[in-house]
């Protein structure tokens, strides 16, 4: 039973537990500030393999993450649509969205980013959702017997996020320009796979991050055009009632999505 009363105490417990688990000779120096404790915790959680954890660890982790995540929640009901009543563009932290599902830009290993404190969306989503997501993803890979293919989609619970579910997809990685037709089609397939999976699970709404535009280096302008075109075509052709949020983080992406919708309206 989780009895720790503060998130700082919970962080210290989780850090100590992961440090003991590593079974190395490094001396653990516990930081004094919450921010430094969080960075140490996050780094340890990021690099931790997909191994079982104790019920006590889960209880402490869940109490802490759910409390921290509750402090910053963005409800879909408060967003203003950019087209019709079912398509939105929103700038902010996707992990704060209270929504049926958010989309995670995963890599082919499918275990979440394992680089300590890396600021990619894969890292942030796994960190804020909890260790259970990595364990679920590891089980998916174990069952299918191979790494995840580009353009496919899988779903896990959201655990400690405000989102009920996470849809994971692996986008194409761009190594040279111009972007090939194959990679354009693969990016479109990512969006289609996520939309189909959302409808198969009878979800009401889904939020997309900007798939492949980070370390996978897909040009942001092309990616925005493909995302908007693919989602609009799917909704029209299938008569899906899904509400779709295009989540952007940078000012540049916000402008690119607005421009894409403006061109679409012309």
UniProtKB/Swiss-Prot annotation:
NCBIfam families: PRK04143.1. Binds 1 Zn(2+) ion per subunit. It comes from Staphylococcus aureus (strain COL). It holds the Pfam family Macro. It catalyses: 4-O-(ADP-D-ribosyl)-L-aspartyl-[protein] + H2O = L-aspartyl-[protein] + ADP-D-ribose + H(+). ADP-D-ribose binds at residues 93-94, 107, 120-122, 212-214, 216. Belongs to the MacroD-type family. Zn-Macro subfamily. This is Protein-ADP-ribose hydrolase. Gene3D superfamilies: Leucine Aminopeptidase, subunit E, domain 1 (3.40.220.10). Keywords: Glycosidase, Hydrolase, Metal-binding, Zinc. Its EC number is 3.2.1.-. The keyword Transferase does not apply. The lineage of its organism: Bacteria, Bacillati, Bacillota, Bacilli, Bacillales. One of its GO terms (molecular function) is hydrolase activity, acting on glycosyl bonds. Its cofactor is Zn(2+). ADP-ribosylhydrolase that specifically reverses the SirTM-mediated mono-ADP-ribosylation at an asparatate residue of GcvH-L, by releasing ADP-ribose from the target protein. May play a role in the regulation of the response to host-induced oxidative stress. Residues 74-265 form the Macro domain. The keyword Metal-binding applies. Zn(2+) binds at residues 113, 118, 120.
């Amino acid at each position: 039973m989780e009895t720790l009363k503060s998130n700082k105490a919970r962080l210290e417990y989780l850090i100590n537990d992961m440090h003991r688990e590593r079974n190395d000779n490094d001396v653990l120096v516990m930081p004094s500030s919450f921010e430094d404790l969080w960075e140490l915790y996050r780094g340890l959680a990021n690099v931790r393999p997909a191994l079982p954890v104790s019920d006590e660890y889960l209880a402490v982790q869940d109490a802490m993450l759910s409390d921290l995540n509750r402090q910053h929640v963005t409800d879909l009901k408060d967003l203003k649509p950019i087209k019709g009543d079912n398509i939105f563009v929103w700038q902010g932290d996707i992990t704060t969205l209270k929504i049926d599902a958010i989309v995670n830009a995963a890599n082919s290993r499918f275990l979440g980013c394992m680089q300590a404190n890396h600021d990619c969306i894969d890292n942030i989503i796994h960190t804020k959702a909890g260790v259970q997501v990595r364990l679920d993803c590891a089980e998916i890979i174990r069952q299918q017997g191979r790494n995840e293919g580009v353009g496919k989609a899988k779903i896990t619970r959201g655990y400690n996020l405000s989102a009920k579910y996470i849809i994971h997809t692996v986008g194409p990685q761009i190594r040279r320009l111009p972007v090939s037709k194959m990679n354009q089609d693969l990016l479109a397939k990512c969006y289609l796979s996520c939309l189909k999976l959302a409808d198969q699970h009878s979800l009401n709404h889904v939020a997309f991050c900007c798939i492949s535009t980070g370390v996978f280096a897909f040009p942001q302008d092309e990616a925005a055009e493909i995302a908007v075109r693919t989602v609009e075509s799917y909704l029209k052709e299938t008569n899906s009632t899904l509400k779709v949020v295009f989540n952007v983080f940078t000012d540049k992406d916000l402008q690119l999505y607005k421009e894409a919708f403006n061109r679409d309206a012309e």
